[in-house]
Each structure stands twice: as structure tokens, then as C-alpha cells.
Regions:
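Generic structural signal for helix capping and beta-alpha/helix-loop junctions
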Residues: 10, 93-94
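Conserved glycosyltransferase catalytic-site signature
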Residues: 66-71, 210
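Membrane-embedded multi-pass helical conduit in multi-pass membrane proteins
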Residues: 143-236, 242, 266-320
């Protein structure tokens, strides 16, 4: 049985509010709909209850992936065990308040899912479960492949602005406008997740552009995780610091400093370069009056730029 996470500190900062929006979409929409439709869902590592007999029958916890909860969930359901997701019963959880800790968490979840996909998908397709479950399980376990695609889209968006204005390609670019439907469907998913659980959902859904920019900004961090997972490069399980932050007046830095991330990753340099590339693209789009490209490139610029600056700022603060 898996319950929905409820956030103790979602109002602590813009960072925690954006995370809450993302996780609400996962629990309220993805987990609930998957479960009701009869597809496999995953235990989220906490806020749930297992039968001991289920764990043992599925082969027990295994340390060969970074997402042992996802791995065990699929092995159990392939054995015929049924999972239940309860949306109306919530369990308190603390969101990461520090960007480098969030990066580590996202890296772990992304890489672990790829490792689990490589391990579990052969078992899924050899099993006797219905084809629709096999297909959806494949989409579920490989969905993090989207991060390299997001990164590539950001890189290519800049030269595409130039190409569009130096040749007769209008009909091709007109066809590409269909991809705006992806933004609309994503917005609707998160809107309904907020509407389902919050009376003030209209105030919360305004964070959607922040969430989208953040997702783009995490593309580089998570692409590295995808590549390492595909190449079987092993890494340690880096825990997410918890500071018992329940309001915006709590000060996290004196508490549990040994868990704080104090190293400035070389990845930040790449994030800054990507931000400058997007900024150049914004200037190019303005020069060619490609107004439609500016919001897209702006989200890349803000995503990479803000995450890079916050990474440096939070690492330096943790050293104090």
C-alpha cells in the first residue's frame, strides 16, 4: 500500500514550492491513474506498507540499483502481488531545501530508474502479463530518456532559429508547432493534480512555468545520470539531507551540517555555458523577430542559469 506524500515545508521557498507541484503531479495523477487502470505502480521508498511475505517472495531487497524500491515493486507485481495507492491518506515528508541536495536526489532517481529498466524490462517482456501492461511498464521505466532529449532540444533550438530565417523551411517549422500540445497536456496534468487536493490550486498552478524551467535546467544533471545508468557505471547512494524544516523561519544551516553538500561540481560550468548559449539564442530570436522562440529559450536560460547560481550559492553557504 502506497500513500500520497504531503509536504511539511512546501512553503519554505520557491524551490520547495516547485518540487511540491512536481510531486503532486506524480502522486495525484500518475500513481493514482496507473493504479486505477490496472498498470504497475512503484513504491516510493517511504509512506507505504509492505507485507513481509511479499518482499521475500519477490526476492527481497537487492542493492544492484539506486532505486531498490522501484526494482522490488516491479518484481513483486510480476509475481502477482497487487499494489494499492491511497490518494486520500497522506504521509508527511520534507522536501530538499538545498539545490545541490535536490540535484543528488534527482540524479539518484534518474540513474536508478535506468538501471531498473535494464534489469526488469527483460523480465517484463518474458512474463505472461497483458501486452498493455508490458508497453506501459516500458514507458514508465524508460521515461527518463526524455532528459537527453530535453538537453538536445535546447542546444538545437538556437541554430534552428538561424536556419528558419536563412532558407525556405516554413512548412517544416509549421508542422513542428504540433509539439506545443506536449506543453498543454503537461499543464493540464499538473493543474488537475493541484485542483484535486488544494482549495487554493489557482495560486499554486502559477508555478508551472517555474517547474518547466527547472525541469529544463535539470536536463544536464539528469542526462549524466541516464548515460551512467546505460553504461553500467556504479555510484554510491547519496542520501538526501533532512533538517526538520517546517516553516520559512527555520534556519537549516546550524542543523546537521555534516549532511550538507559543500563541493562545487564541475557540472556547474557546463550549466553556465548552456545558460549563455540559450541567452545568445534569445538575442538571435529577437533579431529575427522569432517571438515564439523567446519563451522557450528563456526557460532554458533561466533553468540552467538559476540552478547554476543557486548551486554555487548553496554550496558556499553550507561551508560557513
Amino acid at each position: 500500500m502506497q500513500t500520497r506524500w504531503e509536504h511539511l515545508n512546501d512553503e519554505f521557498s520557491l524551490l520547495t514550492r516547485a518540487q511540491a507541484l512536481a510531486l503532486d503531479g506524480h502522486f495525484v495523477m500518475e500513481q493514482q491513474v496507473r493504479n486505477k487502470a490496472g498498470f504497475f505502480i512503484n513504491f516510493n521508498g517511504t509512506a507505504g506498507i509492505w507485507r513481509k511475505s511479499c518482499i521475500l517472495d519477490a526476492g527481497n531487497w537487492q542493492p544492484d540499483t539506486l532505486t531498490e524500491d522501484l526494482d522490488l515493486s516491479y518484481r513483486a507485481q510480476l509475481k502477482g502481488w497487487k499494489f494499492i495507492f491511497i490518494n486520500d491518506f497522506t504521509s508527511p515528508s520534507e522536501l530538499p531545501i538545498e539545490i545541490n541536495a535536490l540535484k543528488n536526489q534527482q540524479f539518484r532517481w534518474t540513474k536508478g530508474a535506468i538501471e531498473t529498466a535494464k534489469k526488469i524490462l527483460p523480465l517484463v517482456w518474458k512474463s505472461s502479463i497483458p501486452l498493455k501492461i508490458k508497453l506501459y511498464s516500458t514507458f514508465h521505466l524508460t521515461m527518463n530518456i526524455v532528459f537527453p532529449l530535453i538537453m538536445i532540444a535546447g542546444l538545437l533550438a538556437v541554430p534552428l532559429v538561424y536556419v528558419k530565417n536563412t532558407g525556405n523551411y516554413d512548412e517544416y517549422f509549421a508542422f513542428m508547432s504540433i509539439f506545443t500540445l506536449a506543453f498543454i497536456s503537461s499543464f493540464l496534468m499538473y493543474m488537475y493534480s493541484q485542483k484535486d487536493v488544494y482549495p487554493d490550486w489557482k495560486r499554486r498552478i502559477y508555478l508551472f512555468p517555474v517547474f518547466m524551467a527547472g525541469s529544463m535546467g535539470f536536463a544536464l544533471n539528469n542526462t549524466k545520470a541516464v548515460i551512467e545508468g546505460l553504461l553500467n557505471k556504479k555510484s554510491e547512494f547519496v542520501r538526501t539531507p533532512k533538517f526538520r524544516i517546517e516553516s520559512d523561519t527555520d534556519n537549516p544551516h546550524p542543523k546537521k551540517k555534516k549532511y550538507a553538500v559543500t563541493k562545487i561540481s564541475p557540472m556547474i560550468i557546463l550549466e553556465l555555458i548552456f545558460a549563455l548559449w540559450a541567452l545568445f539564442g534569445i538575442g538571435l530570436a529577437a533579431y529575427y523577430t522569432e517571438i515564439a522562440a523567446i519563451p522557450f529559450l528563456s526557460m532554458y536560460f533561466l533553468g540552467y542559469g538559476v540552478i547554476a547560481v543557486m548551486s554555487i550559492k548553496h554550496a558556499l553557504e553550507s561551508k560557513k
